[in-house]
Amino acid sequence: MNDRLITPDASGEDEAIDRAIRPRRLTDYIGQPVVREQMEIFVHAARGRGEALDHTLIFGPPGLGKTTLAHIIANEMGVSMRQTSGPVLDKPGDLAALLTNLEPHDVLFVDEIHRLSAVVEEVLYPAMEDFQIDIMIGEGPAARSIKLDLPPFTLVGATTRAGLLTSPLRDRFGIVQRLEYYNVADLSGIVKRSAHLLNLSIDETGCQEIAGRARGTPRIANRLLRRVRDYAEVRADGHISGEVAHAAMELLNVDRNGFDEQDRRLLLAIMEKFDGGPVGLDSIAAAIGEERGTIEDVVEPYLIQQGYLMRTPRGRMATRNAWLHFGLNPPRQPDTSPDLFQDAPPVGRER
């Protein structure tokens, strides 16, 4: 389990709070302007025709609101939503039970859809295309296949790893939306809205202080808001100002770039112990006492995305941004250009 404060993965507390503060309509949805405008058009058009919305794939890094957008789609269409995840649907019968209980135009939301098994995918193809499923009745020589008609429905799939989707499944989605990391202004608006729903007192500088350290991720912003709330109630008068938020973040070891202690240890190890790299992952793991898998899957992605770390064929390297962030001078690169005036071979005499 990942217990980092700035992890984008959801905890039990996150899920409970998210349900309470989740926007219900596109008008309440902050950020992702292109996605919001496109979905507004698609939803209104489908509603106007009295049809189910096209099957929709939502992908992007964790914590950006894929589940929230699925709920909004169902609310905007005025239908119910059934929610499940790829690993849960391990048998075709599990999927068939869900599909046959849907009402016309309902939304079936499948999180981690890239983890569907091949046999379940085979059942899903005719369901998505023809709104029919084939079910086997009986066993052995007496077994026979029957077709069941399904009501028109919308499959909304969410994934953090769109590249792992099979081509036949990906091609059956009529709408594909990618969620991008949020800018500080949008995150500040999300923090302000969440604080209002949680009855917290906060000013603009407090919102910006939290938003700037949230790594572009609403889930992290809301988690930091709750921890700053705790600090404000115990160490201040309950109001979250810029100064209070800054003091809380310093206590929590989250700096202005959203780095925590693990991020700083990794970058400093590469710069101070390995002259900025390149250095192999196993050497880094030994230097900071962390598991290779944790570094690769948990710590590195954000540092690479933000331009502080590079993966090269020879290993990891700290970028110029990393040296500047810590106020360190990068080592001088050796000059490998040839010297035209030294060690030149003797010129023979002309005859």
Swiss-Prot record:
Enzymatic reactions: ATP + H2O = ADP + phosphate + H(+)
HAMAP family: DNA_HJ_migration_RuvB
Keywords, in A-Z order: ATP-binding, Cytoplasm, DNA damage, DNA recombination, DNA repair, DNA-binding, Hydrolase, Nucleotide-binding
NCBIfam families reported in the protein's UniProt record: PRK00080.1, ruvB
Compartments it resides in: Cytoplasm
Function: The RuvA-RuvB-RuvC complex processes Holliday junction (HJ) DNA during genetic recombination and DNA repair, while the RuvA-RuvB complex plays an important role in the rescue of blocked DNA replication forks via replication fork reversal (RFR). RuvA specifically binds to HJ cruciform DNA, conferring on it an open structure. The RuvB hexamer acts as an ATP-dependent pump, pulling dsDNA into and through the RuvAB complex. RuvB forms 2 homohexamers on either side of HJ DNA bound by 1 or 2 RuvA tetramers; 4 subunits per hexamer contact DNA at a time.
GO CC annotation, single: cytoplasm
Gene3D superfamilies (alphabetical): 1.10.8.60, P-loop containing nucleotide triphosphate hydrolases, Winged helix-like DNA-binding domain superfamily/Winged helix DNA-binding domain
Protein name: Holliday junction branch migration complex subunit RuvB
Span list, region Disordered: 328-351
Binding residues for Mg(2+): T67
EC numbers: 3.6.4.-
SMART domains for this protein: AAA
Principal localisation: cytoplasm
GO MF annotations, alphabetized: ATP binding; ATP hydrolysis activity; four-way junction DNA binding; four-way junction helicase activity
Large ATPase domain (RuvB-L) as annotated region, ranges: 1-182
Annotated region described as Head domain (RuvB-H), given as residue ranges: 256-351
Subunit structure: Homohexamer. Forms an RuvA(8)-RuvB(12)-Holliday junction (HJ) complex. HJ DNA is sandwiched between 2 RuvA tetramers; dsDNA enters through RuvA and exits via RuvB. An RuvB hexamer assembles on each DNA strand where it exits the tetramer. Each RuvB hexamer is contacted by two RuvA subunits (via domain III) on 2 adjacent RuvB subunits; this complex drives branch migration. In the full resolvosome a probable DNA-RuvA(4)-RuvB(12)-RuvC(2) complex forms which resolves the HJ.
UniProt family annotation: Belongs to the RuvB family.
Broad class of enzyme this protein falls into: hydrolase
Positions that bind DNA: R292, R311, R316
GO biological process terms held by the UniProt record: DNA recombination; DNA repair
Binding site for ATP: I21, R22, G63, K66, T67, T68, E129, D130, F131, R172, Y182, R219
Cross-referenced InterPro entries: AAA+_ATPase (IPR003593), AAA_lid_4 (IPR041445), DNA_helicase_Holl-junc_RuvB (IPR004605), P-loop_NTPase (IPR027417), RuvB-like_N (IPR008824), RuvB_C (IPR008823), WH-like_DNA-bd_sf (IPR036388), WH_DNA-bd_sf (IPR036390)
Domain note: Has 3 domains, the large (RuvB-L) and small ATPase (RuvB-S) domains and the C-terminal head (RuvB-H) domain. The head domain binds DNA, while the ATPase domains jointly bind ATP, ADP or are empty depending on the state of the subunit in the translocation cycle. During a single DNA translocation step the structure of each domain remains the same, but their relative positions change.
